[in-house]
């Protein structure tokens, strides 16, 4: 089992010195990855239901919390580290132009030596889509097409694509990623997200917990798509009780993420960069689990 750090670009880690300190401490302690969050803009009020709380609202202080652009934050700490992977967890893909995202992600992967993991989601905050001028109603369908576009640009010698939203023939987007692909981790808590992960993802990230039923849906969707049952890596949040790590391993979880703040009510959090070292023994103990 692998361990990553979550919410790395939030709150205090918007500060450049603290960002580097966190990234370097995580790498030194044996964490395999740094995971960032994204909201380009947060409306002061909204009717959309936040899916990860009982009352459908974000926790207090999250609306105006500093939240740097995840890809730029990752590029910044990439220059101060050498091994730790750099992940979005998640990037709200249908809010973006997929050709531009493909370029940005490939550039970051190229410059960091192949360390990027692209976690994607369809988003939940309609008001944010409205501010950005992005389509909310068809965001799932757009996500599927955008993934196909990025993979074409990353891997093809002569990229061409004919889709519902984008079409191009012989469009070069260089440099390509180090391995001509970047692992795509599908985030979400719904059946649709789990099926998308099984059908086309390299990973699945149910944001809270590791529901066995969602993991089963991922495996079923992978099999239906003609993919191996273990083709999709499972990442989830660190349980509040470390004794649950064995249970998660038995469910097929490959990676757990330790929050670096108490964002969203999560209680298992680092006290600061200096706190990363205390995880060394836990990481070593579960390295082959």
Please give the residue ranges for each predicted region:
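Active-site-adjacent structural elements that line small-molecule/cofactor binding pockets in enzymes
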Residues: 1-289
